[in-house]
Amino acid sequence: CREKHLQGNRCEENKMEQLAIDGRKIGPGEKTYIVAEMSANHLQDFHRAVEIVHAAAEAGADALKLQTYTADTITIESDKPYFRITGGTLWDGQTLHGLYEEAYTPWDWQPRLKEEAEKLGMACFSSPFDPTAVEFMEEMKMPAYKIASYEITDIPLIRQCARTMKPVILATGVAHKEEIEAAVQACREEGNQQILLLK
């Protein structure tokens, strides 16, 4: 079965239906949909960010993905051990707040980056991390929402995205099966069947 629902000993098959992001069909029989992730690679330099958009288009990406948060919307400013990075990374000893201040994509850049991506034939959407980010993305008329796997248990955030009736892409990398099921169910309860799961 492509998608299994166990009812007693019976397995039902639900074939995935096609959906579209900015008019580009995604699903069985369609070309692979390639998303270029900007993340923090802009290094707080807008011109570098624009260069990344152009590089993504030249490489054949169908979409550019941003991340929409600020240090204050994703964590608190604290130097307590729980808020310090450890474990042998490049950022050991730094606070989470400090890291996110360096890594975030300024919100005033995002409409301009979206416009640049669209000029080059790419869709542009983002990962929100709190309700204000969803509201901002709606103002920009972004065509889809990508939920980071660390946020898959944030059911209120997922419901807010689902209520826009736009495609919701759920990353599942660090999620348990039950968490994935709860996220999918939340979308469906909001009447949104446009759900994509990423391994």
Located regions from the model:
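Glycine-rich, proline-tolerant flexible connector loops at the mouths of alpha/beta enzymes
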Residues: 63-102
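N-terminal amphipathic alpha-helix/helix-capping segment at the start of soluble metabolic enzymes
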Residues: 16-35
